[in-house]
A protein has these predicted regions:
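Non-catalytic, conserved peripheral segments adjacent to functional cores
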Residues: 1-86, 104-152
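Conserved SET/PR-domain catalytic core that frames the SAM/AdoMet-binding pocket
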Residues: 81-98
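Basic phosphate/pyrophosphate-binding loop/patch that engages nucleotide-derived ligands
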Residues: 101
Length: 152
């Protein structure tokens, strides 16, 4: 067995990270090579996210869309799995997405704002500016993610 702490208010406060979670979600991806994202919400529904893979494995992507940021339009990727127990914090103003590396992958994520369909946006993973090389070929992509609402 094992024990792992998934959240510690004291640690978040030490790094100045928002910890005002309003909702926690579980997402099941049945098939390997499922691509989701890059999702974000516009004001006043911007949100911070805390993402963890509790079963399976993903390559997680965060795209900084904050025009004032030194890392504007920079993309980072982190492998999350049920083996490494890592979590990733996605600040408001950043888009988030992932590709599954195993079937039956389950994610747990908490958010600091409520979902708003009107403020939901998707930035295309396939934007040439991002120059993404996926570790596996994306096979399963939702209509929403194939036809994103925004390309900068």
């Amino acid at each position: 067995g094992y024990f792992t702490r998934t959240f510690c208010k004291k640690e978040f406060k030490k790094f100045g990270i928002n910890d005002k979670w309003v909702q926690s979600n579980i997402s099941l991806n049945k098939k390997k090579n499922t691509l989701r994202g890059l999702h974000f919400q516009t004001k006043p529904f911007e949100e911070d996210k805390l993402v963890r893979c509790i079963k399976g494995s993903i390559l997680d992507y965060i795209l900084d869309l904050r025009k004032y940021s030194k890392t504007y339009m920079k993309l980072i990727k982190v492998r999350l799995s049920d083996k490494n127990f890592l979590s990733v914090y996605v600040p408001r103003g950043c888009a988030h997405g992932y590709i599954t590396l195993k079937s039956d992958t389950i994610l747990s994520y908490s958010v600091t704002n409520y979902y708003s369909k009107k403020n939901e946006r998707t930035y295309s993973f396939f934007d040439k500016k991002l120059k993404i090389k996926f570790p596996v070929k994306p096979k399963y992509i939702s209509k929403k993610d194939l036809n994103p609402k925004i390309i900068l």
